[in-house]
């Protein structure tokens, strides 16, 4: 999970914006 979250933070720093970071966190919580 930490690896996924780390990648999400990388996307968050990308031009996509913080929305991608929030989406990743939601996916982490949604997945078991």
From Swiss-Prot:
<dbReference type="GO" id="GO:0005179">
    <property type="term" value="F:hormone activity"/>
</dbReference>
<dbReference type="InterPro" id="IPR030480">
    <property type="entry name" value="Natr_peptide_CS"/>
</dbReference>
<keyword id="KW-0382">Hypotensive agent</keyword>
<keyword id="KW-0840">Vasodilator</keyword>
<dbReference type="GO" id="GO:0097746">
    <property type="term" value="P:blood vessel diameter maintenance"/>
</dbReference>
<dbReference type="GO" id="GO:0005576">
    <property type="term" value="C:extracellular region"/>
</dbReference>
<dbReference type="GO" id="GO:0008217">
    <property type="term" value="P:regulation of blood pressure"/>
</dbReference>
<keyword id="KW-0800">Toxin</keyword>
<dbReference type="GO" id="GO:0090729">
    <property type="term" value="F:toxin activity"/>
</dbReference>
<dbReference type="InterPro" id="IPR000663">
    <property type="entry name" value="Natr_peptide"/>
</dbReference>
<keyword id="KW-1015">Disulfide bond</keyword>
<dbReference type="Pfam" id="PF00212">
    <property type="entry name" value="ANP"/>
</dbReference>
<comment type="similarity">
    <text>Belongs to the natriuretic peptide family. Snake NP subfamily.</text>
</comment>
<dbReference type="GO" id="GO:0042311">
    <property type="term" value="P:vasodilation"/>
</dbReference>
<keyword id="KW-0838">Vasoactive</keyword>
<dbReference type="InterPro" id="IPR002408">
    <property type="entry name" value="Natriuretic_peptide_brain"/>
</dbReference>
<feature type="disulfide bond">
    <location>
        <begin position="8"/>
        <end position="24"/>
    </location>
</feature>
<keyword id="KW-0964">Secreted</keyword>
<comment type="function">
    <text>Snake venom natriuretic peptide that exhibits hypotensive and vasorelaxant effects. Produces a dose-dependent hypotension in rats, followed by significant increases in concentrations of markers of nitric oxide (NO) formation measured in the plasma and vasorelaxation in a thoracic aortic ring bath. The peptide may exert its hypotensive action, at least in part, through stimulation of NO production. The vasorelaxant effect is endothelium-dependent and does not appear to be mediated by the natriuretic peptide receptor-A, as its action is not modified by isatin (a potent NPR1 antagonist).</text>
</comment>
<protein>
    <recommendedName>
        <fullName>Natriuretic peptide Coa_NP2</fullName>
    </recommendedName>
</protein>
């Amino acid at each position: 999970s930490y690896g996924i979250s780390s990648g999400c933070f990388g996307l968050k720093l990308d031009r996509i914006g913080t929305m991608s970071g929030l989406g990743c966190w939601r996916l982490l919580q949604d997945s078991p």
